[in-house]
Amino acid sequence: MNGLRERGCAQRPRPARATAAARLGTLLTALLPVAAPALAAGYPPPVEGDFILKDFRFASGESLPQLRIHYRTFGQPRADASGVVRNAVLIMHGTGGSGGSLVREEFAGELFGPGQPLDTTRYFIVLPDGIGHGRSSKPSDGLRGHFPHYGYNDMVQAQYLLLTQGLKVNHARLIMGTSMGGMHTWLWGEQHPQFMDALMPLASLPAQISGRNRVWRRTIIDAIRHDPDWKGGEYQAEPPSLRTALEMLWLMGSNPVLRYQEAPNLARADEVIDAYVAHGMQTEDANDLLYALAASSDYDPGPGLAKIAAPLMAVNSADDLINPPELGILEREIGRVPHGRAAVIPFRENTHGHGSHTHAVLWKQHLDELLRSPQR
């Protein structure tokens, strides 16, 4: 399966991107390189590929003649005597991230090695780059502000087609995701209730984006859209509003204690945020971020929670500014999921606010327990 560039669109030169420096899933955590190579962690490097979806139609009515979905896989699929794949695991990243942003010591290093919960000798692990992210088709490839407006439902549909058509996976042992990927997990359970044995959404809520979670997203969206240097998405240099976006992402991505430890006085705070923004201005794209945040507008799993048939374990953290437990949403809504359970990780020295979703040591015991549930 070959990669592509959008038809009829010349690419403007851009600096090289660091896919491990992701926005909400990992950029919100920290703009850091991926940890040591996979082999050093005891699991093999991923196999990478591109799946091309022809004439993909978005819920908006827009379409692309070719939609590229990039992916990484670990391990090999195994089917039973009836041809049903029994060991596939789909893991979906957060906003602005990529599948590669999860191939790092604190996530894959805790899960993919020998004897670990998702040992790659036992499981076939699929890490896709969502629409608009990583090396999948995205605005900065060339269409810029003319890229189709995608939503979370479009992203889930593309993931489903990648598994079923591209990788010939007809069943999943587990579907899980972090942040945006966690929200996708809820949608997967509703839209394809018989496809998986188990579900694990991390750092997400089964409800429409609202309150502070909507407002911080709107702050970034409005800053970019009302920036005259954005030029309707046709800029040649990143608009100044990307700085505002990066500052907001830094604010929301961790907990106040960690941020204070990183920046304990005025001078140090300015140094830290200046360095973070300077790096992001070289690696991030305003259109890509704008589209990625706007994509959450169609997220509304609430009405369909009773459709989820598989055992589901939702995990959030008490110091998550984006999904604060004080709202009581997770505790209230999990009762509507027939086989749903939820846990909130208490605030402690090794939690990372919203970014706790990437630190598997905090929650992998819940994954172990979930994987002990029977296959369906």
Features from the language model and the residues they span:
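Catalytic active-site module of serine/aspartate enzymes centered on a nucleophile-bearing elbow/loop
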Residues: 340-376
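Alpha/beta-hydrolase-fold enzymes
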Residues: 195-279
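Short beta-strand/loop motif that positions the catalytic acidic residue
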Residues: 308, 314-316
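Conserved hydrolase catalytic core segment
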Residues: 171-210
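N-terminal cap/lid subdomain of alpha/beta-hydrolase-fold enzymes
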Residues: 72-141
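Active-site nucleophile elbow and catalytic-triad environment of alpha/beta-hydrolase enzymes
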Residues: 288-304
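Conserved alpha/beta-hydrolase "acid-adjacent" motif
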Residues: 321-328
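Conserved acidic catalytic loop of the alpha/beta-hydrolase fold
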Residues: 153-173
